[in-house]
Structure formats: C-alpha cells, structure tokens
Swiss-Prot record:
It comes from the Eukaryota. PANTHER family: AUXILIN/CYCLIN G-ASSOCIATED KINASE-RELATED, J DOMAIN-CONTAINING PROTEIN. This is UBA domain-containing protein 7. The keyword Chaperone applies. Residues 1-94, 306-346, 547-573 are annotated as: Disordered. InterPro entries: DnaJ_domain (IPR001623), J_dom_sf (IPR036869), TPR-like_helical_dom_sf (IPR011990), TPR_rpt (IPR019734), UBA (IPR015940). The lineage of its organism: Eukaryota, Fungi, Dikarya, Ascomycota, Taphrinomycotina. Residues 13-32 have a biased composition (Low complexity). It comes from Schizosaccharomyces pombe (strain 972 / ATCC 24843). One of its GO terms (cellular component) is vesicle. GO terms for molecular function: clathrin binding; Hsp70 protein binding; polyubiquitin modification-dependent protein binding. Keywords: Chaperone, TPR repeat.
Length: 697
C-alpha cells in the first residue's frame, strides 16, 4: 500500500510540477506560515532510485487531475469568485492543503476562526489595509437608521458556518463612520422619528453627546417619572381605600344597629304578650253567661282564709296549744306546697283537672274531676275540715318497710312512666300491663305501691272492669291504714290525697253497681273529714234519692190497696219514673260493659293486624286505615303518593283523628266500632308524636 500511495512522487514530471506550483502561488496573495509548518514544507522527501516504473501511474494520474483543492472548495462554499486567481494546472502539490490543516491543528485558536481569517485574507486586495475582524464586525442598532436599510445577515459567533461577504463588511464600516459623523440636527430628527417629544429630544441632546446616550437619558428619565407616578397613585389609592373602608364600616354598623333594634322590639312584644296572658290567667274574668255558683266559687269550694274563720281564744292554762286557725293554715300551706311540686307524679291529677274544667267549668285550683260523667273526683285540698281530732305530724309513726335496691327502684319508675304515657294516649290495656309489671317488682304493703294501684284502678274503671277496680282501691286503702295518710307523703306528695281520690272512685263505682247505701256511706265519710264541695254533696244527694225512691217503691207495693185519690200519689209516681230511668241506665251500662269485655279480644286482634310492623310509621298507618274503619265513618282512603309532604301528612292525620275520636263518635255507633276507634286514636296519636320529632314540627 505504501507503494501505491507514493505514486505521484516517483513520476518523472515531478520537477516541472513543482515549478508550476510555484508559478501558480506567485499569482495568489502571499501569506506567511508559522516556522514549524514552513520547515516541514521545505523538507525534501528522499526518492528511491531503484524504484521500478509503476504500471498504474497513469490510472492514478487521471484521478489526481480531477481532484479539487481545499481552497477551491472553500471559495465555492463562500460563493465569491476569486478575480486574482488564474486557472491552475492539473499538477499541484498535495502537501499544500495538508500543511494548512497541520498548521491549524497546532494553533490554539479556534478552527473556524482561523479558516475565516484565511478566507478574509484571500478576499482582501494586497493594497488594502489590514482590518481586524473585531473592528469590521461592530453591531449597531439598525432600527435607529430607518432611511438607510442595510441587508446584514444575523450572526452571533464569528467563525460559524455562514461567513460574512466582503461587501457587507464595507457597508457596516461605512455606516458606523456615518453615525459618528451625525450632526445634532440629524440626531434630533432621528429622535423625533423614534417617537420622542420635542422637549425630550432637545433635553437629551443637551445632556448627551451621541444618539445612543440621548436615548438612554430619555429612558432613564421616563423610568424615574414612572416610579414617582406609581408612588402618587399608591398614596391616592391608599387614601381612597381608607375612605371606602370607613364607609363600609359605617354601613355595617348601621345594619347591625337596625337588626338589634328589630330583635329587641320583637322580644319586647313577645314579653309583653306573655305578661298580658299571665295577668289574664291570674285575673278572674267574669262571664255573664255563667251561673252565680261559678263566679262565686269561693262560696262553694275555696279555702277559708284565717281572717274569715272565727278565732278561738287561747286558754291561759294551756299556753302551749296552737290556735286552731293557725294550725289549719299551716297544714293548708304545707299541703299546697306538696301538691304544687308533684303534679306529674300521679296520672289521675292530669286527667281529673282536665275533665273537670270541661264538664263543670270550676277553676282548676278549686277541685279535680274526671273525663267521664259517671266518673267524679274529690276536691283535693281546697276545703279541708278543721278537725281537732286529726293526729299531728309529730304523732305519726314511721313505717317500717323494706329498702329497695337501686336497680329495682329505677325499673319501677321507668315502667310507671311508660304506663302513664300509654294512659295519656288512650291505650289502657297496655298501661295496665305496665303497672302490673311494676307492682310485681315491689313487696306487699310497700308505700310505692300506692300510686301504681291508684293509676291501675283508674285504668280498670276506664275499660269497664269495675270489680278489679274496687280490688285495687281496697288494697290501696289497706296500705295507707287507719290514719288515712295524714302527715305522710310519697315523693313529696301527701298520702291523704291518694286516699281521698280512691275513696271517691270507690263511691262512683259502687253507685254504678247500684250499691247506693255503701256509696252514700263513703260520701258521708268524706264530708265528715272536711271535704265540703258541690261534688261530694251531689253524690250524697244522688244516693239518698236512689235509696228513697227504692224504699218508696217498696212501700207503694205494700200499700196498693189504698185509694188512688191519696194526696201523695203524684209524687210517688214521679219518683218511680225517675227510678226506672236510673235502673234502665244502669242496665244499659252493665250490658255495655259486658259487651265491651266480650269484644275486646277480637277487636284487639284486628287492630294488631293493622298496626303490625308500622307502629311508628304514620304514613303507612294512614294509608291502611280504611282496612279497620266501617263505612259509616265516611273515611276516604289515602294513598302513599299523597302523603309525601309533611303538610299533607298533617292534614290527613287531622282528618283521621276527627273520624276516630271517642268523644266525636255518633251515639248509634256500636260497641265494636267504639273499641276500634279508641285503639286507632291511641295508635295514631303515638305515631304523630314520633312524626313531629322526626320532621321538627
């Protein structure tokens, strides 16, 4: 391979080629090379004398004739023709370009920069003065010279692949020199052309010596003015924001003031209304439609004040005795205090006070009654008898009874409260079960059995089980004892109240059973104990009338042979008619009780089937209410789609209650339908209470 590569050096025409090369070089601009490169170029390569002629010389000679030198390639790349160059011969020295490359590789400069310098030296004429690249290429702001457009290629790095033509360098140089020679008028015109004002241009030219300095001066001054304007704007904004905040605060304070005033006004109106209602309740408003005994209730049932009662003088020999009127007043005060704190302990108080106002229109603090006409109650403590034989509190013996466990006491109270709630809703059978469960937890003769027996006896009276009612009353009286509960209390309530209430109930039940003599004895005992009221007097008169009519009837039977023209025949006939009416009423009541007891279980099954699984779902109960009601009730069926809104549910509930309310049923309603209505009313009432809690009504 070495022989093949050295084909050009062993040719016989080598000296002539060297001469041609030297002649060609003489035409081009000369340039000096570094010393190492020149020495390498002048070095003689030894020839091999005994080298035979190469048979492939002509072949390679043709290829070398077609080669293009590196300099020509560079000229073609730049695209500028060389006017000084002449056509060179086909024979040239190949080491010329190699030496240039070797020189460039040994220099520390950048390769592109060296090539660029060589190209510029070849382009520049010999007579032209040497100008460095940094002097030729000076970037100016061409936007400042709009009237002299210059097509200058954009380049950042000198020596890049795109070289700068020689003509463009001359234009840049001429432009720079023209800028340096601009007059003040021309600079003024250029500043005006750039958009600056007259004052700005003149002031900038006075404080600067060139166009660039003038532009910088104007820009700096504008920046300073902008900062000053920003400061003024910030101060103005801060002042305006402070005023805005003050106005907002003032508006907010006015709004709060108006709201507080409105709320205070509303509260004042509410308080004034409540005060007016309280005063009206306290004030005894007289109604001209009421009879005299209702308005002057103090003549019949009010307490006697110490000023009205005659005072008994105190004997000197017994100074330790207390006057009778003071003793009565003290007992009355303590009794009223005990009653005021325990209105919720007994269920009977709630019912009697409510029904008494509706039937007799007595004041609520005068006496207590019941919801049923046949069912009356005693006047609690409003007209107590002044009894000197009544044992004082100091003489009452303390009861010795078993102490209950805390768990048992809690269970009994819970069951009692549940039974009271069921009674208020009208579910008497379930209330009886709860009271019975509570009584089973307590020992016999325990004082806590008294309120439970009292409530259960009332439930039995409601359902018509009069015999069981009498049994509970007798057990209660046996627990209270012969002292009749004077000086004793249960849960801060006088035990005598329970005694009197249940004795009144016993007298009513005996009167219903046509045991008028026993009922009369109870009424007389209550009156003898100081229970002087219209309620007890009426009971006594009824029993006396029934007894007298019964005796007169028997007497008339014995004297049937007497002439009809006797003067007392009319009175006897009237009394006998009254007695017949009373007996017929008693027979109807007994038949009604028997029928109620007979139909209770079948009706309960029907009601349980209706309410099963939906006791607390008022919508489902109303939607299926038609399954248990009778046609004469005139109930229109309601679907669940009509009971979506709580308002619609309330309307349907009010209609259902008006249909099944026990007091609003027609007189010809059968016993079975009455029982169904009572049970449905109780269940709907319970579901309505739950519905109100769930929907916040």
């Amino acid at each position: 391979m070495d022989d093949l590569l050295d084909f050009n050096f062993y040719d016989k025409s080598t000296p002539s080629n060297q001469n041609n090369y030297s002649n060609n070089n003489s035409r081009t601009p000369s340039y000096s090379l570094p010393a190492p490169v020149a020495q390498k170029k002048n070095a003689q390569i030894p020839l091999k004398a005994s080298k035979p002629e190469d048979p492939f010389a002509n072949l390679f000679q043709k290829k070398t004739d077609n080669k293009i030198s590196l300099k020509e390639l560079e000229r073609q790349k730049v695209g500028t023709p060389d006017s000084n160059s002449t056509p060179k011969s086909s024979n040239y020295d190949p080491f010329e370009n190699l030496e240039i490359l070797h020189q460039l590789s040994n220099t520390p400069r950048d390769k592109d920069a060296v090539i660029h310098d060589k190209i510029e030296e070849n382009k520049r004429p010999i007579s032209q003065p040497q100008v460095s690249a940094s002097e030729k290429v000076t970037l100016k702001d061409l936007s400042l010279e709009p009237h002299q457009p210059v097509s200058l290629p954009a380049f950042e790095n000198i020596g890049s692949e795109t070289s700068i033509p020689f003509e463009n360098h001359n234009e840049i140089t001429n432009m720079n020199t023209a800028k340096d020679k601009l007059s003040s008028n021309e600079m003024y015109e250029k500043l005006r052309d750039l958009g600056f004002s007259d004052d700005q241009s003149r002031l900038a030219l006075e404080n600067s010596g060139s166009l660039e300095d003038a532009i910088e001066y104007i820009l700096e001054k504008d920046n300073a003015k902008g900062q000053y304007r920003e400061g003024e704007a910030y101060e103005a904004f801060s002042d305006s924001s402070a005023k805005t905040q003050f106005s907002d605060f003032q508006a907010l304070s006015n709004q709060l003031k108006s709201q507080l005033f409105e709320k205070a006004n509303d509260l004042w109106n509410i308080g004034r209304k409540k005060l007016r209602d309280a005063v009206e309740e306290r004030r005894a408003v007289k109604d001209p439609s009421k009879p005299r005994w209702m308005d002057a209730s103090h003549d019949f049932g009010r307490e006697a004040t110490p000023e009205i009662l005659p005072k008994t003088p105190i004997p000197k020999r017994k100074p330790h005795k207390v006057p009778m009127n003071e003793k009565v007043s003290e007992d009355r005060i303590t009794t009223n205090q005990s009653r005021s704190g325990n209105d919720e302990s007994s269920l009977v108080d709630f019912l009697t006070s409510k029904s008494d106002n509706s039937s007799f229109n007595f004041p609520s603090d005068t006496y207590e009654g019941t919801e049923n006409i046949l069912e009356t109650a005693y006047e609690s403590t409003t007209a107590r008898q002044v009894n000197n034989n009544k044992p004082g509190k100091s003489t009452v013996k303390k009861r010795e009874e078993e102490t209950l466990n805390n768990m048992v006491s809690a269970l009994v109270e819970e069951q009692q409260s549940t039974g009271n709630e069921l009674f208020r809703k009208g579910d008497f059978s379930q209330a009886i079960e709860e009271f019975t469960n509570s009584l089973s937890q307590l020992p016999a003769k325990h004082t806590k059995r008294v309120p439970l027996l009292s409530n259960r006896s009332l439930c039995y009276q409601k359902v018509g089980d009069l015999k069981t009612c009498l049994q509970d009353v007798d057990e209660l009286v046996d627990i209270i004892g012969e002292e009749k509960g004077h000086g004793e209390s249960i849960r801060d309530k006088s035990m005598n109240d329970y005694y009197v209430k249940n004795m009144v109930r016993k007298a009513q039940v005996l009167e219903q059973l046509e045991k008028y003599q026993e009922s009369l004895n109870i009424w007389k005992d209550l009156i003898a104990d100081g229970q002087i009221s219209k309620l007890y007097i009426d009971g006594k008169h009824r029993c006396e009338a029934a007894i007298s009519s019964h005796s007169s009837e028997s007497h008339s039977k014995r004297t049937t042979q007497q002439p009809k023209s006797t003067p007392n025949h009319t009175n006897i006939k009237v009394k006998s008619e009254r007695l017949q009416h009373v007996r017929m009423a008693q027979q109807k009541a007994e038949q009604l009780d028997e029928e109620r007891s007979r139909l209770r279980e079948p009706v309960q099954q029907i009601v349980n089937k209706w309410k099963e699984g939906k006791e607390s779902n008022l919508r489902a109960l109303l939607a299926s209410l038609d399954t248990i009601l009778w046609p004469e009730c005139r109930w229109q069926k309601v679907s669940l789609s009509e009971l979506v809104l709580p308002k619609k549910v309330k309307i349907a509930y009010m209609k259902a209650v008006s249909r099944v309310h026990p007091d609003k049923l027609p007189q010809q309603t059968s016993v079975e339908h009455q029982l169904i209505a009572e049970s449905a009313f109780s269940i709907l009432n319970h579901a309505w209470e739950l519905f109100k809690q769930q929907n916040d009504l």
